[in-house]
A protein has these predicted regions:
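Transcription factor C-terminal regulatory/effector domains that mediate ligand binding, dimerization
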Residues: 1-169
Length: 169
């Protein structure tokens, strides 16, 4: 049924995040502590970004603004910067729940979908519910918006009209 599909989709996001954790050189233990600081903010003499997939490489903001490492695992640089700059002004637990709470079927329309290699932004898609709820994260994320419509077109669905979704009250 549809609830199981959404649960599987969230499980895929969980898997994708874990793959991206490894791709940037961290372990899942690194993010378990609420007080963890991104590896990109710590002095790492042997650390090199050369081996990190392009979409996951740290931005200037990631390198200079201390933040929790969970933000580093999304392949959307502008969205990561937006989350870091927002600081404590948004409920990151609520966002995490929408993305990865595969055990909860109450709010199934608000999630991300991952269709391929997790480090490639072209393999991610957002649902309309996610776009409406978290639109402030998407206003400067054209790669995620383009990828979403590419996947919708692939399935024969109408593309989202972003100006309508992102400007709705």
């Amino acid at each position: 049924n549809r609830d199981h599909l959404i649960s599987l989709s969230r499980l895929n996001v969980h898997k994708a995040i874990n793959e991206n954790i490894r791709a940037v050189g961290m372990t899942s233990r690194w993010i378990q502590d609420d007080d963890s600081i991104s590896i990109f903010n710590l002095a790492q003499p042997s650390f090199s970004i050369e081996g990190i997939p392009l979409c996951l490489r740290p931005t200037f903001i990631q390198l200079h603004v201390p933040h929790h490492p969970w933000i580093d695992f999304f392949p959307f640089p502008r969205m990561r910067d937006c989350m870091i700059l927002a600081g404590d002004s948004f409920d990151d637990d609520d966002l995490c729940h929408d993305l990865m709470a595969f055990w909860d079927t109450r709010n199934t329309a608000t999630t991300l979908l991952v269709w391929g290699d997790s480090w490639d932004a072209k393999n991610w898609e957002i649902t309309e519910g996610f776009a409406q709820k978290w639109k402030w994260l998407l206003l400067d994320s054209p790669e995620l918006l383009a990828s979403t419509n590419r996947w919708r077109k692939f399935r024969g669905e109408k593309p989202f009209i972003w100006k309508d979704i992102l400007t709705e009250a």
